[in-house]
């Protein structure tokens, strides 16, 4: 047994081992030791000596040396360099195991790279594991993993696992495949029993991924390998050394339980030269030898509880029976292609109990469910049930005749049932259901047990819809029961055509809450909805029955007497404009109210009088409206500077008046001085004070008088310009004199206003023009619409 950090060879063994290989004599002897227990991913201590020129084993190696002797570390390092190129090529997939496992798991090099610790392996006497060339049909390996065997006398089994191999026949020799099974004994395997309980029904297809995931994480377990045996393993010594495989079994048991764990999916196609008698003899030798070894292991102090393994054995037996049943029904395709490629064999891994069953009793959860679904679908679809693609006597597809009586909302989960029997008959009912057979097939759907249907819906989570096919009544309970057990069973019975979906969505159950509520909402607006229903009924009376018309008929019949009373009131709505105003004819709509709010910021009319000369500028004229908006903007800009100018004039006015008063005072004083040479200073001062107060009061009133004069001038200009504008635009007023009376001027202004809209003075424009004295505001959009209407009325008269 190889122990870490030290070698147990003597000097004579080392010299004899060096002398057996010529290619290694030139390499200097180097022996190193370390006591570090760190896991190494590049340990090659267990590799056998090979000859690199022809890829065959050194046969003298087994003769000169005992199998239990250990190879030194320098040879392992040399072999590492020798097989480095082969290790690179071993990381690819082979055709025989596409989608199953990588070929790198078959190589001994990869196994040693994956090994967390350098545990020993049982060794075979005559055969090894490795690359088997297909061309020469050689039974020898290019590479073989030398397993440093633990002798039966050794008592240290705590750090090392025990591995052995067995080869048996499965189920009375029906399949003659050589099996190599690795059973492992380690204390850490107790924690794997719970994991086996969870994965006991999995298929052997998914154990590859489980081994790949666990190979990099479990530090206490040995390297991983896929057990692929060699064709000829008939040595009694081989089976004698491989007796560790059933040390967990009881004394009265033999190896058939372990034989059941082997499946055809992971076995290699054997060569036909194997004899059945030799195998049975080997099995007997194996069973007797395993009991002796089991007793020796228990004496060695390897305290391993047998209860978990007994429980695990039962679990594996259940999985083995399922897998064996599967292998008998479906032959493995990987075995047929296996010998087409060169592959690398490796011994069994020492990882866990899950790998003991060798990808046979465990499988992925998803694949298990998929296989179970396939088996259940086989039960669901017997031979007497016609498929979805079958057609009846007349050549119509059976799915076209099917209309379900329920709908399941995928977003809310609400189920809506359509109890009306007429909803099942679609537009093809009159043509297809002529014979009694088709009607009977339709009646079988209606006569199904609703209790079973609801129970299956609650358990399965989706509605189970029956097919409109023969014998659907006898097969539907099976579908419902399976759907209640497994909610992942895909049901493709629901018709996915656009017409059927539309019909199903439009069908509302009067008994359901949602359907009754929607019917009440529709019948509240009886004016417009009853009009549509009455029109549809009149149109569909002569036409053939369609799903849409049937729904209108059923909905109208379910509406009640209130809807029938209101049917006469809806007859007066014969135009689309009145239909829009069905809620209230005189009431303003929301859009109209928004327009009124928008018009509040628009410019109001100038005055409420229409008999003046300026009536042309009222809101009825679009051009006048635009001109007024332009002038109003200019006037508002001028008005901004009114207050600053007024204040500036008020500041300047006292200065001007003060200078005038001073001049007048000087002239007055000169006259007084000439007339009165005497001194009258007191009286002059009083007069000056009196005039100054009067001047100030006059100056205060002067700006208001000036503004009044300005307003009078502006109003005169406005009136004169309005009269000139009215005279220039109206061609009739050119021949008239200005001495006309007030009535003539009023009629002229009316004609001028009409001519702005229509050049020929048509009276039709007056009808479409707004009332001038109304104070309702307008917008440009309203005025343009009115102008366009008047323009369209005047166009035929111009032609």
Swiss-Prot record:
Bias-annotated ranges (Acidic residues): 157-170
Any one of the GO CC terms: fungal-type vacuole membrane
Pfam families: TCO89 (PF10452)
Composition bias, Low complexity: 348-363
Bilayer topology: Peripheral membrane protein
Region of interest (Disordered), residue spans: 18-41, 97-171, 201-284, 324-391, 418-476, 538-568, 663-685
Top-level taxon of the source organism: Eukaryota
Primary localization class, coarse: membrane
Residues with Phosphoserine modification: 84, 104, 107, 115, 144, 203, 215, 290, 397, 575, 707
Compositionally biased residues, Polar residues: 97-126, 233-243, 254-269, 420-429, 461-476
Record keywords, A-Z: Cell membrane, Membrane, Phosphoprotein, Vacuole
Mutant phenotype after disruption: Abnormal activation of TORC1 signaling. Abnormal punctate localization of TOR1. Sensitive to high hydrostatic pressure (mechanical stress).
Phosphothreonine PTM sites in chain numbering: 52, 82
Role description: Component of TORC1, which regulates multiple cellular processes to control cell growth in response to environmental signals. Nutrient limitation and environmental stress signals cause inactivation of TORC1. Active TORC1 positively controls ribosome biogenesis via control of rRNA, ribosomal protein and tRNA gene expression, and rRNA processing. TORC1 positively controls protein biosynthesis by regulation of mRNA stability, translation initiation factor activity, and high-affinity amino acid permeases that serve to provide amino acids for use by the translation machinery.
Family as reported in the entry's similarity comment: Belongs to the TORC subunit TCO89 family.
Other notes: Present with 243 molecules/cell in log phase SD medium.
Known partners and oligomeric status: The target of rapamycin complex 1 (TORC1) is composed of at least KOG1, LST8, TCO89 and either TOR1 (TORC1-A) or TOR2 (TORC1-B). Interacts with PIB2; following activation of PIB2 by glutamine or cysteine. TORC1 binds to and is inhibited by FKBP-rapamycin.
Protein name: Target of rapamycin complex 1 subunit TCO89
Organism whose genome encodes this protein: Saccharomyces cerevisiae (strain ATCC 204508 / S288c) (Baker's yeast)
């Amino acid at each position: 047994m190889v122990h870490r950090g030290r070698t147990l060879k003597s000097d004579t063994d080392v010299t004899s081992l060096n002398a057996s290989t010529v290619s290694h004599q030139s390499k200097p002897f180097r022996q190193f030791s370390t006591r570090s227990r760190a896991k190494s991913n590049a340990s090659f201590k267990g590799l056998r000596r090979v000859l690199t020129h022809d890829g065959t084993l050194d046969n003298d190696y087994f003769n000169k040396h005992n199998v239990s002797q250990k190879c030194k570390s320098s040879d392992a390092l040399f072999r590492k360099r020798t097989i480095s190129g082969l290790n690179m090529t071993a990381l690819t997939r082979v055709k025989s195991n596409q989608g199953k496992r990588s070929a790198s798991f078959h190589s001994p090099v990869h196994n040693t790279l994956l090994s967390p610790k350098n545990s020993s392996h049982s060794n075979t006497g005559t055969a090894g594991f490795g690359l088997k060339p297909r061309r020469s049909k050689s039974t020898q390996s290019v590479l073989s993993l030398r397993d440093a065997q633990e002798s039966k006398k050794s008592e240290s089994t705590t750090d090392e696992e025990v591995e052995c191999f067995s080869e048996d026949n499965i189920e009375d020799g029906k399949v003659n495949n050589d099996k190599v099974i690795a059973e492992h004994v380690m204390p850490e395997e107790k924690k794997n029993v719970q994991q086996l309980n969870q994965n006991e029904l999995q298929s052997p297809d998914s154990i590859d991924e489980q081994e790949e995931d666990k190979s990099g994480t479990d530090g206490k377990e040995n390297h991983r390998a896929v057990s692929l045996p060699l064709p000829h393993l008939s040595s009694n010594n081989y089976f004698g050394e491989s007796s560790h495989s059933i040390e967990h079994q009881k004394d009265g048991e033999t190896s058939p339980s372990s034989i059941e764990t082997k499946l055809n999916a992971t076995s290699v196609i054997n060569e036909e030269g194997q004899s059945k008698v030799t195998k049975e003899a080997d099995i007997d030798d194996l069973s007797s030898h395993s009991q002796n070894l089991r007793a020796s292991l228990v004496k060695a102090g390897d305290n391993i509880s047998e209860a978990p393994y007994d429980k695990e054995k039962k679990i594996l037996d259940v999985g083995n029976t399922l897998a064996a049943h599967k292998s008998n029904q479906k032959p493995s395709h990987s075995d047929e292609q296996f010998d087409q490629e060169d592959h690398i064999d490796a011994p069994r891994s020492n990882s866990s109990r899950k790998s003991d069953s060798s990808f046979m009793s465990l499988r992925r959860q998803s694949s298990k469910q998929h296989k179970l679904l396939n088996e259940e679908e086989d039960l669901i679809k017997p031979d007497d049930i016609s498929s979805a693609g079958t057609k009846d006597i007349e050549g119509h597809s059976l799915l076209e005749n099917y209309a379900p009586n329920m709908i399941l909302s995928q977003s809310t989960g609400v189920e809506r049932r359509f109890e009306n029997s007429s909803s099942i008959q679609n537009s093809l009912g009159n043509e297809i259901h002529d014979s009694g057979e088709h009607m009977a097939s339709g009646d079988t759907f209606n006569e199904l047990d609703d209790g079973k249907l609801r129970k299956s819906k609650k358990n399965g989570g989706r509605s189970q819809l029956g097919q409109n096919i023969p014998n659907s009544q006898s097969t539907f309970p099976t579908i419902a029961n399976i759907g209640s057990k497994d909610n992942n069973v895909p049901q493709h019975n629901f018709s996915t055509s656009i017409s059927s979906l539309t019909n199903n969505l439009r069908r509302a159950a009067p008994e359901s809450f949602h359907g009754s509520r929607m019917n009440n909402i529709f019948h509240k607006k009886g004016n417009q909805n009853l009009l549509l229903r009455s029109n549809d009924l009149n149109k569909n009376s002569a036409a053939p029955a369609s799903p849409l018309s049937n729904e209108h008929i059923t909905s109208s019949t379910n509406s009640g007497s209130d809807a029938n009373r209101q049917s006469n009131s809806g007859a007066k709505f014969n135009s689309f404009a009145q239909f829009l105003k069905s809620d209230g004819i005189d009431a303003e709509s929301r859009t109209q109210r928004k327009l009124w709010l928008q018009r509040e910021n628009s410019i109001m009319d100038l005055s409420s009088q229409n008999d003046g000369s300026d009536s042309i500028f009222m809101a009825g004229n679009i051009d006048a409206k635009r001109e007024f908006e332009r002038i109003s903007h200019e006037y508002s800009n001028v008005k901004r500077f009114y207050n600053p100018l007024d204040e500036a004039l008020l500041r300047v006015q006292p200065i001007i008046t003060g200078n005038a008063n001073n001049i007048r005072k000087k002239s007055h004083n000169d006259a007084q001085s000439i007339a009165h040479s005497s001194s009258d200073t007191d009286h002059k001062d009083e007069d000056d004070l009196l005039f100054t107060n009067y001047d100030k009061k006059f100056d205060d009133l002067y700006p208001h008088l000036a503004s009044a004069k300005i307003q009078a001038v502006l109003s005169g200009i406005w009136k004169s310009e309005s009269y000139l504008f009215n005279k220039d635009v109206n061609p009739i007023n050119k021949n008239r004199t200005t001495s006309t009376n007030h009535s003539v001027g009023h009629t002229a202004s009316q004609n001028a206003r009409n001519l702005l809209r229509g050049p020929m003075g048509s009276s039709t424009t007056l009808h479409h023009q707004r009332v001038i004295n109304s104070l309702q505001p307008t917008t440009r959009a309203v005025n343009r619409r009115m102008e366009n209407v008047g323009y369209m009325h005047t166009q035929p008269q111009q032609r």
